[in-house]
Structures are given as structure tokens and as C-alpha cells.
Amino acid sequence: MKRILILTVVLLSGVYLASAQSTRYTAFEPASVWNDTDGNIINAHGGGVIFVKNKYYWFGEKRGRGASEGVNVYSSPDLLNWKFERLALATDTVNAQSDIARGCIMERPKVIYNDKTGQYVMWFHLELKGQGYKAARAGVAVSENVTGPFRFINSFRPNGHMSRDMTLFKDDNGDAYHIYSSRENYDLRISKLSDDYLFPTSKDTLLFSNHREAPAIFKHKKNYYLITSGCTGWDPNKASLHIADNLFGPWKNLGDPMIGPNSELTFGGQSTYVLPVQGKKGAFIFMADKWNPRNLIDSRYIWLPVSVNDGKVEIRWRERWDLKAMKDSK
Ligand code: DGJ
């Protein structure tokens, strides 16, 4: 009996070792399998990244085949090799009445740091359990530590508006904003957040009504750039880029910034975030999700360099690239 047990343990650990492959990455390979430093697939979809004391932290949706299982956080010093930190925000498995009761949908989490309160504040798109995508709310959670665990605070429709795909943006002066798809995704809106970043203020404006979602924003010099997708469920579509020198508009449509094979479908992906690279002037990475609705956990990541040259933005497909290839923007 004892021998059988030992044999089973040895065999099982062999299977485990064989299935978990840890690779030391030296380059980005968009849309390829990307494992964490333990050799498990990175499970952080619709995500965003912040930089804290020499490390990047990647927050994203933890997905099962279809299930929404909370928000994961990973850390990395080099943007290529990611260590799984923890489930940063869990669904509530105890209180079935909670807005984030197990069975809810949490999408597109973004985290920013509030210098005044010393808290990391997470906003995400929340759909209530059993209601499909009807609730259209924003959820807010906080933590004193970047890796969490985050405490759920509240969920609401900002100023009464439906809120689905979303992102957060913290400006250089510390003011922060929530950019969100509203009115059944026909409108894209922006609201300035309260000083503690926990609520929207009444400064809440329509950006444009082009039926767009998946907002990803960045600032270069005096301009704000906003990448969005069309609304075709999990299927990819054409991206567009808007520019403004004021977050509340007017926003000018600059067309599709993607270049290369399948660029008219965002290379098979959908925008989620634009990440400023530390220590490189005006260097940004475009982050997108290549969704696999039949097995959401296996949705892949498309990370590509953004080039900004005198206000002209280009995102060119690359099979394989590294940060050395990134040029400072003009
Ligand atoms: C597109 C959105 O961008 C995703 O985040 C997700 O909500 C899917 N629609 C669901 O169909």
C-alpha cells in the first residue's frame, strides 16, 4: 500500500513537472503562449500595469474556461518574466447577496495609486450574478499593498450611466479619470474621480458616440491618445485612435494606427491598456487581448511597441521583439 502511494506521488509530481514549463523570456512573442515564472499560463486578461519601486505589476481578469474568477496580480522587473503574486480581488464566496458574489463577472480591472490616501485603488467592470451584461456597473476596491488583497468597497453606475468596458487614467498632477462605455456601448464617457479616487464626480462628459469599447489611453507631451475597439463581442475588429489636448475633448479621430498583416482586425486582438515603459522617453507598449471565448483562460496577449513621431502614432505587428528595439519617441 505504502509503495503504491509513493509511486502515485512520484508519478503525479512527474506529470506536474511535465505540465508546468518555466521559461526565461528574452523577447515578446505576441499571441504566443506566455507562462509565468512557475510555468503556469499567465491568467490576467483585459488588464493593466502599474510601476511601483522598480517593479511592474500586471492586474487582469482571472478566467476559467468561461468563468470569471476575480482579479490576478503578477510582478516583473523586466516586463517579460512575470511572477504570480496572488488573487488580488476574490469573488465573495460567503455572502450570496454581495455585488461580487461568486458568479458575478469582473472585467478590465485597472489599478492606480492615490498619493493622498496611500491606497491602491482598483476599478473594474462589474456584472451582477445571473444577469448577463445587464447591470453595467463599475466596481471599486482598495488595498494598502500593491499586491492586495483588495477589499471591495462599492459598485454603481457612475452618475447613473451604464458602465461596461473601462479604463483609469492618472494625470501628471494626480487627478484621475474613469473612461467608460455607456448607453449600451454607443457612448464613450469620462468622469473625473473624487480626490480619494473612490467615486466619480459630477464632472462627467460624453467623449463621442461612435459605438466603441476597450478604451486604452496614454499621454505624450501635451497630448492624450485614446485607442478603442468596435463592439463585436469577443471577435476582433478595427481599432481607432483619437487625440485631444484636453481629456474632456474635443477628441479628433486619427483613424486606425495598426500596421501589418491583419491590422484591420487589430491583429486578432482588442485593446486593453497602453503601458509607459520606465526609463525610456515616450516609449509605450500597446496591450491587447486575443480572446478565445471557447476557453477564456487561453486568451492570448498581444503586446507591441507604440511609436509616436511628431504626433503620428503607429503600432506595427512584430513576431518577436524586445525593449532594445524601442526608440525614444519624438
Ligand atoms: C467585449 C468586451 O470588450 C470584453 O471585455 C467582454 O465584455 C466581451 N465584449 C464580452 O462579450
Language-model features: locations:
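Bacterial Sec-dependent N-terminal signal peptides
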Residues: M1-S22
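Carbohydrate-active catalytic/glycan-binding domains of CAZyme proteins
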Residues: A20-K330
